Curated annotation (Swiss-Prot):
GO terms for biological process: D-glucuronate catabolic process. Its EC number is 4.2.1.8. This is Mannonate dehydratase. GO terms for molecular function: ferrous iron binding; manganese ion binding; mannonate dehydratase activity. The gene is uxuA. It comes from Mannheimia succiniciproducens (strain KCTC 0769BP / MBEL55E).
Length: 394
């Protein structure tokens, strides 16, 4: 696998020099300064590419070219945004970039309730607490109809949780959920957030699929033509939240994807941390079944807690993900491609990482501190080497 690292651009506290020392060779990057929907010009792409290459690295994957909200809701100028998206893909291809990760999650890119959950060893992780989230939705946001989402017991626990919250607690939880995380292109006030949710109130999962199908059938042929592999990222967490439709969460959703637009350019990001939150997702089976369409891998593990809808991000080789067999399946696919004359390795990045050691004293992007990811990348490098020696290079 190609060892890559997500870099948020010149303002990232983790520098390209740091990344090179970590042993990564590929950079995962996006032009975050360009507003959603606008074309990424060849000039802007080349400017960023030159910065990366001057550091001795390669711009391996774009993550993400954001899908404008009006494309998802099929309102306003969505056809213009789609044409702009096509042009961005053409421009990326012209600059030699061949892999684009994106998602079709409405409103929020990824959602956590705690961005600094302290683990027993003193390091900090990201966490999603189902009861804290219910308290936010029922008593802070007060989303109409939210009570239908929760059991009577969950509502009772959420009320008790909310009653113990201080004003500072409420502010922090709200900020964690809606203020925008790394990779989320927008942050919202409570009022703006509810307004965004309201745009989806008449969009069922079935209708949302028709919007996604329209997008795919417009975009994927262009990607196919210019030689770009599109790798959709799953919902995070992979289930409906906030009354929003979520349609990239299961192996059935992956099959729908392939059936809806069956071109090789239409593929997946295997994010083990997102898919792995659901106990009914067999990550090894998913990787094996759709291996020929996996163009990017986010390797991360989560640990479900006593409430099975609550989880925190575990160390990369621990938690609920069978990382040994997922990586083995990815390598099996990579060797299959190699036998067919394909030289492109599957880009892999250590997804998130615990805040630990010296990083505990620094301001870092939640989930994207340096040392936790350095540790994860080193572990995956060792796992890959061992798997290759035992199973693939006899």
């Amino acid at each position: 696998m190609e060892q890559t690292w997500r870099w948020y651009g010149p303002n990232d506290p983790v520098s390209l020099a740091d990344i090179r020392q970590a042993g990564a060779t590929g950079i995962v990057n996006a032009l975050h300064h360009i507003p959603n929907g606008q074309v990424w010009s060849v000039e802007e792409i080349e400017k960023r590419k030159a910065i990366i290459e001057a550091a001795g690295l390669t711009w391996s994957v774009v993550e993400s070219v954001p899908v404008h909200e009006e494309i998802k809701t099929q309102t306003g100028n969505y056809k213009t945004w789609i044409e702009n998206y096509k042009q961005t893909l053409r421009n990326l291809a012209q600059c030699g970039i061949d892999t684009v990760c994106y998602n079709f999650m409405p409103v929020l890119d990824w959602t956590r309730t705690d961005l600094a959950y302290e683990l027993p060893d003193g390091s900090k992780a990201l966490r999603f607490d189902q009861i804290a989230f219910a308290a936010f939705e029922l008593h802070i946001l007060k989303r109409p109809g939210a009570e239908q989402t929760y059991t009577a017991e969950e509502q009772k626990q959420a009320k008790a949780y909310f009653d113990k919250m201080s004003d500072a607690d409420i502010k922090q939880l709200t900020s964690n959920i809606i203020a925008g995380l790394p990779g989320a292109e927008e942050g919202y006030t409570l009022e703006e957030f509810q307004g965004q949710l309201d745009r989806y109130k008449d969009i069922s999962p079935e209708k949302f699929r028709t919007h996604l199908a329209y997008f795919l059938n417009e975009i994927i042929p262009v990607a196919q033509e210019v030689g770009i592999k599109m790798a959709v990222h799953p919902d995070d967490p992979p289930r409906p939240i906030l009354g929003l439709p979520r349609i990239v969460s299961t192996i059935e959703d992956m099959q729908w994807y392939v059936d809806t637009c069956d071109l090789p350019a239409n593929g997946f990001t295997m994010c083990t941390g997102s898919y792995g939150v659901r106990a009914d997702n067999d990550l090894v089976k998913m990787t094996e079944k759709f291996g020929d369409r996996i163009y990017f891998a986010h390797l991360r593990s989560t640990c479900r807690e006593d409430n099975p809808l609550t989880f925190h991000e575990a160390a990369h080789l621990q938690g609920d993900v069978d990382m040994f067999n997922v990586v083995k399946a990815l390598l099996t696919e990579e060797y299959r491609r190699k036998a067919n004359g394909e030289t492109r390795l599957i880009p892999m990045r250590p997804d998130h990482g615990h805040q630990m050691l010296d990083d505990l004293k620094k301001k870092t992007n939640p989930g994207y501190s340096a040392i936790g990811r350095l540790k994860g990348l080193a572990e995956f490098r060792g796992l890959e080497m061992a798997l290759k020696k035992v199973f693939f290079e006899k």
